[in-house]
């Protein structure tokens, strides 16, 4: 069994699978942009009690598996991340601006799933295999 997270009053193990899509599925995410987006996540996440477990991308979306604390307001974190990463990615990679719609990087919506329905290793493998070339 995996080690549980804990705080003063609880023990927990909360895994989430997040999918964030580029607005109108514009094809702008390459390896350097994904790596920078991941660095931004790793900078912001600790302030919200979030730990990154897996990160991968396809050309128009990213998959993230992370752990969080019960008190974490996930929607606030996700919106803060999307806002900061959008601003920084457009500044650091100005060439993507011409592919975006009205300067908007991320779609306003996102998909957030708990990892309780499938074993974490299955989700981990799924994320690791995202973006692989299909024959």
Q: Where are the model-predicted features located?
A:
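Basic nucleic-acid-binding interfaces
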Residues: 1-135
């Amino acid at each position: 069994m995996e080690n549980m997270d804990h705080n003063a009053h609880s023990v927990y193990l909360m895994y989430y699978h997040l999918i964030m899509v580029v607005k109108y599925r514009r094809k702008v995410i390459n390896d350097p942009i994904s790596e920078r987006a991941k660095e931004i996540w790793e900078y912001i996440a600790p302030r919200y009690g979030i730990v990154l477990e897996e990160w991968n991308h396809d050309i128009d979306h990213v998959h993230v598996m992370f752990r969080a604390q019960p008190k974490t307001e996930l929607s606030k974190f996700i919106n803060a991340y999307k806002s900061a990463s959008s601003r920084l990615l457009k500044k650091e990679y100005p060439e993507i601006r011409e592919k975006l719609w009205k300067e908007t990087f991320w779609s306003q919506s996102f998909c957030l799933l708990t990892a309780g329905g499938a074993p974490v290793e299955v989700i981990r493998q799924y994320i690791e295999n995202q973006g692989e070339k299909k024959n």
